[in-house]
């Protein structure tokens, strides 16, 4: 059986689900796109090729192998996008919470049945149907759980709004001893530079006390400033709108001092090295065309 343990975003990783790009399916139509960035690349004819995405994901698998991390992969479903495993579930403490994701993506959950079957039933949780949540919006951080959400009355109109207030309340009830802190995110169905698809598109804690942050991803300035105060301005790497668009905040921590990052994130990677991090650079620019990167395509199950 799997002894799940996730207390935060950066303790030493031991076991993870990494998505797969095999048999990813045809290029979607504009109507089939779930996010504005994918739409841009469908229209431009630059939507990523399957072989390029496979190459990128296997390079991440090799990094995990280098550090002795146990890696699970989803069972491959023909003609189906299974890259972003973070969307389908998440772990807090010893509980696996199945995400209530977009209906078109339900098959993704069945593709990790071989993983879920190793988790005790009492530790597998499905939230009520009216609780919409995806793993990219949920960040355990020791005594806190940070959650990205959108509470506007026009929530149903945004395919980019993935986590609702009902889910925030449900997670607080599941973990009564944790401090659940929610953040209203900026949403756009059409402008990728004005859209924080998930919380990890504009924020991520790294190391012991540092964070990557993009101000415009937050609808309410006070909530952005709360994070600045929480981590301390000197510990924050603030990214520009273009860097947010390129997914700079969506790196992935193997430990408190080892981070997997995209090789083209020059400014961020330089800062990370200056701060004492080991940076494992990979090519992930094709995956990024679907408005997701390294954190989005990983689902940590066990950390120290």
Role assignments for model-derived ranges:
Residues 1-304:
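The feature marks the mature, well-folded catalytic cores of soluble enzymes
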């Amino acid at each position: 059986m799997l002894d799940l343990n996730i207390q935060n975003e950066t303790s030493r990783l031991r076991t993870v689900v990494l998505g797969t790009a095999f048999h990813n399916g045809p290029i979607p139509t504009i109507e089939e796109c779930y996010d504005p960035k994918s739409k841009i690349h469908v229209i431009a004819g630059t939507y990523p090729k399957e072989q390029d995405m496979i190459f990128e994901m296997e390079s991440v698998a090799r990094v995990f192998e280098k550090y002795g991390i146990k890696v699970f992969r989803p069972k491959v479903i023909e003609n189906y996008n299974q890259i972003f495993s973070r969307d389908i579930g998440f772990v807090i403490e010893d509980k696996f919470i199945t995400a209530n994701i977009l209906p078109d993506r339900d098959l993704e959950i069945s593709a990790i049945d071989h993983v879920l079957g190793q988790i005790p039933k009492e530790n597998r949780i499905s939230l009520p149907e009216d609780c919409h949540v995806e793993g990219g919006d949920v960040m355990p951080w020791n005594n806190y759980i940070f959650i990205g959400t959108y509470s506007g009355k026009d929530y149903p109109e945004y395919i980019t709004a993935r986590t609702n207030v009902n889910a925030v309340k449900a997670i607080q009830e599941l973990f009564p001893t944790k401090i659940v802190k929610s953040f209203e995110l900026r949403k756009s169905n059409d402008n990728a530079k004005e859209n924080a698809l998930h919380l990890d598109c504009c924020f991520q804690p790294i190391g012991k006390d540092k964070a990557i942050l993009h101000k415009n991803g937050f609808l309410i300035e006070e909530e952005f400033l709360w994070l600045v105060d929480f981590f301390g301005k000197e510990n924050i790497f603030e990214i520009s709108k273009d860097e947010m668009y390129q997914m700079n905040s969506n790196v992935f921590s193997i430990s408190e001092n080892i981070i997997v990052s995209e090789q083209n994130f020059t400014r961020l990677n330089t800062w990370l090295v200056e701060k004492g991090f080991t940076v494992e650079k990979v090519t992930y620019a094709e995956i990024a065309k679907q408005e997701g990167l390294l954190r989005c395509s990983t689902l940590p199950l066990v950390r120290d």
